[in-house]
Amino acid sequence: MKKVFIPLVFFFCLVIFLAIGLNRDPREIPSPLIGKPAPAFNLVTLESDKTFSPEQMLGKVWMFNVWATWCVACREEHPVLVAFAEKNQVPIVGLSYKEIQPQDPAAKQSDAIKLQVARERSAVWLQRHGNPYTTSVMDLDGRVGIQYGVYGVPETYVIDQQGVIRFKHVGAVTPQLLAEKILPLMQGLGKS
């Protein structure tokens, strides 16, 4: 009797754990950064050699969107961000992430040339698809992405007035996500 019972209990436990895992949304990856200050960085902007730091956004609720011209999902979410930026007075800061990939011919060039190529590609892409960003910064080597725990692009963060990360979304932002989670959160943070 025990020989049949123990494997049967083990099997049912395994099925329960698998069912729980399959019902979770993979885009809702828990981030250890939620509730903690946004990692500091200082990167050059897409527009000029001026630099941007999250400290410049203290006192404002803002979105931080990690994107790349080579990212297919970024193309899907981009019209949503453009429409959101037109309707809302919320700053969106873009992080152009690893624009120069290792297999890219520009990867063998100097850092200055890589930056120039990345800026040109990003600027052309934003001209073609619209620019929802208050500013966009260049993360050529992906170090800032690592600090933010980026799993892949696109990723979007909501950061409050004190510079604390309040929300992280992995994957394309949809109108439904904006309406149901991001906008209510940002409005609530704006009142506090």
Predicted regions and their residues:
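A short beta-strand-turn-helix
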Residues: 41-63
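Hydrophobic beta-strand anchors of alpha/beta hydrolase catalytic cores
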Residues: 63-64, 92, 156
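Thiol-/selenol-based redox modules, centered on thioredoxin-like
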Residues: 158-192
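N-terminal targeting signals for export/organelle localization
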Residues: 1-42, 191-192
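Short, internal strand/loop/helix patches
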Residues: 111-158
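Conserved redox-active cysteine motifs that mediate thiol-disulfide chemistry
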Residues: 66-83, 97
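Short pre-active-site segment immediately N-terminal to redox-active cysteine/selenocysteine motifs
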Residues: 60-62, 66-70, 99, 152
